[in-house]
């Protein structure tokens, strides 16, 4: 790890401060962080060590290298999605780095999942890999798919970092002096993914099963007894499901002979008890042609509840043509996962109560984004996917499940997602849902996503020309600067070649631009537009030659604000006067969409006005009698102290073809909102608590 950065988030803090200072419409929202308790914020855990797992075969062709989709750049793409969410809700997230925490592949919570043989073998293979690579030999065993999995000595450090990040995520939602000081939700951005890894067999980019390692750590450290795993990756999590069979007492094929099993390969089920609930493409890996054995297809289609200590439910993705058609699929088909997960938790509570034992639940999300509408077609060869809004809707349903059974505790672990667009947009929408906010259709538009993913280029640099009204491009560059500042190791691993080949005055490095010299522009909110001068309006309609002349006059007569080492622009009510620069890095296909920019801008302004009040509408669950009693749901709005009683008893119901009654539709929320999913789920919130989210913010 780089010793140049004592605090790995220092660069991000400074960039965030510049963002806030240059965006007066978010200053109040950022300051409001002091009034929001930690329990109401979502923790985002970054894993710098995960970057160390790099494709090591230097002798392969460039075309072959391009086929390696599980790469460090995936974390950069996720950082873009994280920063996009932070710019929208700057007071609702706490950012953590696990740079000082490396777990052990031989830790008890790893060995309980994978046994002692596989972690030891994996370490040995990584240690031997470098010598093989120097000889030009494939470093993985012949029985492995060398196109999917690669190893090097640095892979050990990456896996240690992944384990450490997982532990940090679990600690974040369970450890603290009081409930008010503990967050209820955490998203952990890690790689490589884990849900294809079996008890003793790696597969599909996965070397350890991250979800089960997290579950075992939560059980060992915080006495979690029952866990629901919700998996929305495009691919079936065959490894996660297989380990659920092991937890139920069934002998894994890879496990050595053990006398504790009976003649049928079964023994008593282990704690913690885990239910696995997945939606995936039945025609993609591991059930794609070439992998689609009869056994694999059966596994990816298993549906069994409360039998033989197993709770597994699989749903296959269907094609759709319009988002409304998808919403019908979601309500009538995919939400069945939550009904089954609810059934698992309720049965578990009843059983534990009958045994006189304490119940403690947790919801784990295997958050893969390769089912996104923005994923590359080579990954989605069978034309099934989900709209970006799905990631918000599904996550909000997961929050409700957790609120009903687990005191709101949700741990989300990044799984798949291999194109920059899929990861950026998916993480963005997922984090909006993780804070129970509404997804806005414009945020997931092609143009918005395209602008954000520009920041995933190692040699990214800001546009040299901007229109003052091009809100999307201005906002996207704010997002990019924040995202590229999140992990200092991006410089050494991803940006290195681009920086080394850049001229000395280049803007390629993800360096911080302080408020006094920042290119971060103010969002153009209505109050700014109303204060814009008539001269500015005339200016926008004048020829460029006239614009250039007037810009020179403005520079000579007014105070100027430095935008970069070479470029200056007048400091006006609305920044970024149109300027003449070379267009070597401009998007020639770009067409300014005035209506989209106006609509996008309105959504941004509306958030800054009411994000806190909307967020602090809390759902309190009051228990009557024992844990199995029905729950009374109350939603409190702190803004106006209005209290309304929700319909029903809060239980999930098996979906039907009948469209539910639609309740209040929030302004600018284009995703349909239904009475059985649109409720706030933030628990243990106190207005008296004033802990800041990372006091530096």
Curated annotation (Swiss-Prot):
Stretches for region Histone deacetylase: 40-440
Entry GO MF terms: histone deacetylase activity; histone deacetylase activity, hydrolytic mechanism
Localization: Nucleus
Matches recorded under CDD domains: HDAC_Hos3
Active site annotation, chain numbering: 196
Reactions catalysed: N(6)-acetyl-L-lysyl-[histone] + H2O = L-lysyl-[histone] + acetate
Bias kind Polar residues: ranges: 561-573, 665-674
UniProt biased composition (Basic and acidic residues): 534-560, 625-638
Enzyme class: hydrolase
EC number: 3.5.1.98
General function of this protein: Responsible for the deacetylation of lysine residues on the N-terminal part of the core histones (H2A, H2B, H3 and H4). Histone deacetylation gives a tag for epigenetic repression and plays an important role in transcriptional regulation, cell cycle progression and developmental events. Histone deacetylases act via the formation of large multiprotein complexes.
Quaternary data: Homodimer.
Family per similarity comment: Belongs to the histone deacetylase family. HD type 1 subfamily.
Name of protein: Histone deacetylase HOS3
Organism annotation: Saccharomyces cerevisiae (strain ATCC 204508 / S288c) (Baker's yeast)
Gene, per the UniProt record: HOS3
């Amino acid at each position: 790890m780089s010793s140049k950065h004592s605090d790995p988030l220092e660069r991000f803090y400074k960039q965030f401060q510049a963002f806030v200072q240059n965006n007066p419409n978010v200053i109040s929202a950022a300051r409001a962080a002091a009034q929001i308790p930690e329990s109401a914020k979502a923790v985002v855990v970054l894993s710098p060590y995960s970057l160390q797992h790099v494709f090591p075969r230097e002798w392969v062709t460039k075309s072959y290298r391009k086929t390696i989709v599980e790469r460090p750049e995936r974390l950069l793409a996720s950082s873009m999605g994280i920063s996009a969410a932070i710019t929208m809700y700057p007071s609702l997230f706490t950012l953590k780095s696990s740079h000082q925490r490396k777990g052990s592949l031989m830790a008890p919570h790893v060995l309980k999942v994978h046994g002692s043989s596989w972690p030891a073998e994996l370490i040995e293979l990584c240690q031997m890999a470098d010598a093989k690579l120097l000889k030009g030999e494939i470093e993985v065993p012949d029985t492995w798919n060398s196109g999917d999995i690669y190893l090097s000595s640095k892979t050990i450090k990456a896996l240690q970092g992944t384990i450490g990040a997982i532990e940090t995520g679990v600690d974040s939602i369970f450890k603290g002096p009081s409930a008010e000081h503990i967050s209820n939700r955490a998203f952990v951005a890690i790689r490589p993914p884990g849900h294809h890894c079996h008890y003793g067999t790696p597969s599909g980019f996965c070397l350890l099963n991250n979800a089960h390692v997290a579950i075992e750590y939560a059980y060992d450290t915080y006495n979690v007894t029952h866990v629901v795993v919700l998996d929305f990756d495009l691919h079936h999590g065959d490894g996660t499901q297989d380990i659920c069979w092991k937890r139920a007492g069934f002998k894994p094929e890879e496990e050595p002979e053990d006398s504790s099993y009976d003649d049928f390969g079964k023994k008593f089920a282990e704690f913690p008890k885990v239910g696995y609930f997945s939606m995936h493409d039945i025609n993609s890996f591991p059930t794609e042609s070439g992998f689609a054995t009869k056994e694999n297809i059966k596994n990816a289609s298993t549906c069994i509840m409360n039998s033989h200590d197993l709770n597994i439910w699989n749903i296959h993705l269907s094609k759709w043509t319009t988002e409304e058609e998808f919403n019908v699929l979601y309500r009538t088909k995919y939400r069945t996962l939550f009904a089954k997960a609810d059934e698992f938790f309720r049965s578990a509570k009843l059983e534990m109560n009958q045994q006189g034992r304490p119940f403690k639940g947790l919801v784990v999300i295997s958050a893969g984004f390769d089912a996104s509408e923005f994923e590359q077609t080579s990954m989605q060869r069978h034309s099934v996917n989900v709209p970006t809004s799905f990631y918000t809707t599904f996550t909000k349903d997961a929050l409700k499940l957790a609120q009903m059974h687990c005191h709101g505790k949700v741990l989300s672990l990044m799984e798949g997602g291999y194109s920059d667009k899929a990861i950026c947009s998916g993480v963005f929408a997922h984090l909006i849902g993780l804070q129970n906010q509404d997804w806005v259709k414009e945020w997931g538009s092609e143009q918005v996503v395209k602008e954000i993913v520009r920041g995933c280029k190692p040699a990214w640099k800001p546009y040299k020309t901007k229109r003052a009204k091009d809100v999307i491009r201005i906002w996207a560059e704010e997002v990019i600067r924040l995202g590229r500042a999140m992990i200092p190791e991006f410089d050494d691993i991803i940006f290195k070649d681009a920086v080394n080949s850049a001229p000395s005055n280049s803007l390629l490095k993800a360096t911080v631009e302080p408020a006094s010299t920042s290119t971060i522009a103010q969002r153009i909110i209505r109050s700014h537009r109303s204060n814009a001068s008539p001269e500015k309006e005339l200016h926008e309609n004048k020829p460029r030659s006239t614009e250039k002349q007037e810009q020179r006059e403005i520079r000579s007569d007014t105070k100027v604000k430095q935008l970069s080492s070479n470029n200056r622009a007048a400091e006006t009510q609305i920044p970024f006067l149109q300027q003449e620069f070379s267009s070597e890095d401009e998007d020639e296909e770009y067409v300014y969409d005035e209506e989209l920019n106006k609509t996008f801008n309105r959504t941004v302004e509306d958030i800054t006005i009411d994000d806190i009040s909307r967020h602090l509408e809390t759902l309190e669950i009051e228990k009557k009698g024992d844990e199995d009693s029905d729950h009374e749901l109350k939603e409190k709005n702190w803004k106006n102290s209005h209290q309304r009683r929700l319909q029903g008893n809060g239980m999930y119901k098996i979906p039907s073809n009948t469209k539910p009654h639609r309740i209040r539709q929030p302004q600018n929320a284009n995703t349909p909102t239904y009475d059985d999913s649109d409720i706030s789920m933030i628990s243990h919130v106190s207005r008296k608590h004033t802990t800041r989210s990372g006091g530096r913010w």
